[in-house]
């Protein structure tokens, strides 16, 4: 039986070799297991999880080993010695696991283990290298297929905004103390702050889907969070993050419906069950969206130190809540 220890995070794309040198674990510390690709495959955000674990050690009184234990296969017996398995789905070329690994994963979850599938939600309209921050409350097709073979009787369900995960340690959105920049720079542009508070991350929540095993939340999937956890050796957030928000203006509803485009359209499910339609151009970021009400808005990207720091602070708070919730529930 897995012993769940009771206890009392910073993202641009960085690549590193998948294999890290194994070293002795920290005594009496909680160690996170991370699935890595095969030898020689580069992994994304190598500084992310260690940075998040250091943050939790500093801010929560928890004691985590800041070096994850990397395993190459889910049949590795060391998996069963630790309560949490972290998997960045963007690092995996595919998730078509052999049957013995599927059985090992089911056994791990049935015995009390917790699986966090970072980047387990991915919007097709964003392309391979872009993050995701709103709507599309559905797991990736390969995730759905994998767990149909492990728990055929179960489905992923969106976490409601009032779920305990969103308030188990941090609550709400970051404030000025989280931004780590000069006071006169801390205020976000009004259009950005309004969209964040009302639509992007309302009440400090995020798009998660989960699956329950034996009456507990045992599997959690989200859009990529690791991009917001990393810090460099000087304590600065890496990488810079931009915000994608939706903006409207007088005449948009009439003009955009008449505009021409040569890219694809993508339906994205919202948490209210309705669909947005995203319009794009080849090789470009999403351009505009038609919402279920008939309203049209454009996607606009904002960048800057205060925006990037705000995003990192938010993703770190969410990451912290995920791991603390997993340990205490």
PLM feature segments, named:
Residues 23-27, 77-81, 101, 108-110, ...:
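Extracellular/periplasmic catalytic domains that process cell-envelope and extracellular macromolecules
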Residues 84-131:
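Short alpha-beta junction capping motif
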Residues 20-84, 91-92, 226-227, 241-329:
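Aromatic-Pro/Gly-enriched surface loop or interdomain linker
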Residues 3-16:
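Bacterial N-terminal signal peptides
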Residues 143-209, 213-225, 252:
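Acidic, glycine-rich loop-and-strand cores that form catalytic or ligand-binding grooves
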Residues 37-41, 91-94, 115, 121-126, ...:
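Solvent-exposed loop/turn segments at secondary-structure junctions
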């Amino acid at each position: 039986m897995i012993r769940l220890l009771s206890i009392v995070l910073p993202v641009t794309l960085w690549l590193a070799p998948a294999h890290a040198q194994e070293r002795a674990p920290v005594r009496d510390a909680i160690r996170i297991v991370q699935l890595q690709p095969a030898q020689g495959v580069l992994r994304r955000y190598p500084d992310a999880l260690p940075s998040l674990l250091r943050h939790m050690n500093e801010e929560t009184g928890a004691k985590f080993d800041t070096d994850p234990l990397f395993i190459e296969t889910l049949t590795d017996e060391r998996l069963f010695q630790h309560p949490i398995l972290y998997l960045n789905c963007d690092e995996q070329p595919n998730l078509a696991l052999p049957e013995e690994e599927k059985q090992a994963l089911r056994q791990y979850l049935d015995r009390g283990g917790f699986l966090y599938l970072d980047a387990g939600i991915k919007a097709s309209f964003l392309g391979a290298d872009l993050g995701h921050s709103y709507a599309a409350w559905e797991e990736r097709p390969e995730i759905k297929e994998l767990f149909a073979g492990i728990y055929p009787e179960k489905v992923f369900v969106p976490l409601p905004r009032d779920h305990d995960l969103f308030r188990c340690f941090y609550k709400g959105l970051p404030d000025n103390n989280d931004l780590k920049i000069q006071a006169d720079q801390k205020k976000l542009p009004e259009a950005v702050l309004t969209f964040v508070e009302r639509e992007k991350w309302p009440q400090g929540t995020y798009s998660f889907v989960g699956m329950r095993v034996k009456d507990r939340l045992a599997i959690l999937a989200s859009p990529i969070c690791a991009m917001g956890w990393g810090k460099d050796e000087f304590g600065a957030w890496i990488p810079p993050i931009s915000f994608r928000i939706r903006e409207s203006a007088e005449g948009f509803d009439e003009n955009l419906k008449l505009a021409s485009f040569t890219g694809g359209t993508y339906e994205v499910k919202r948490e209210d069950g309705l669909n947005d339609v995203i319009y794009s151009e080849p090789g470009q970021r999403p351009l505009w969206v038609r919402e279920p009400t008939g309203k049209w808005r454009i996607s606009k990207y904002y960048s800057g130190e205060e925006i990037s720091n705000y995003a990192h602070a938010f993703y770190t708070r969410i990451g912290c809540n995920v791991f603390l919730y997993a340990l205490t529930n």
